[in-house]
Amino acid sequence: MADEENTTEILLSVSLRKARFSSKSRRADTSIKMLKDAVARYTKSDRDRIWVDNKVNELIWSRGRRKVPTRVNIKVIKLEDGTSEIILP
């Protein structure tokens, strides 16, 4: 998907500690939203135009819904059309 167009790549380390303030049954969902918000802030794009790779999703959900990792290292690829992809480095 990213090979076809001109792209910009960014390596980020996103802290997900504030997801611990949400209820236990919604921590993984909150972490995905926080991840998208952080990427939207750095790439200056809309949150709806951000695509999360399946491996990143599996990393956040790896220990279940209640025990999310506190920090995630990701690679963001911003495409020319304004969409962004979140993948593992």
UniProtKB/Swiss-Prot annotation:
Cross-referenced SUPFAM superfamilies: Ribosomal protein L31e (SSF54575)
Protein name: Large ribosomal subunit protein eL31
Gene3D superfamilies: 3.10.440.10
CDD domains: Ribosomal_L31e
GO biological process terms on file: translation
Pfam family, any one: Ribosomal_L31e
Family label: Belongs to the eukaryotic ribosomal protein eL31 family.
A Gene Ontology molecular function term of the record: structural constituent of ribosome
UniProt xrefs under InterPro entries: Ribosomal_eL31 (IPR000054), Ribosomal_eL31_CS (IPR020052), Ribosomal_eL31_dom_sf (IPR023621)
Superkingdom of origin organism: Archaea
Record's GO cellular component terms: ribonucleoprotein complex; ribosome
Record key words, sorted: Ribonucleoprotein, Ribosomal protein
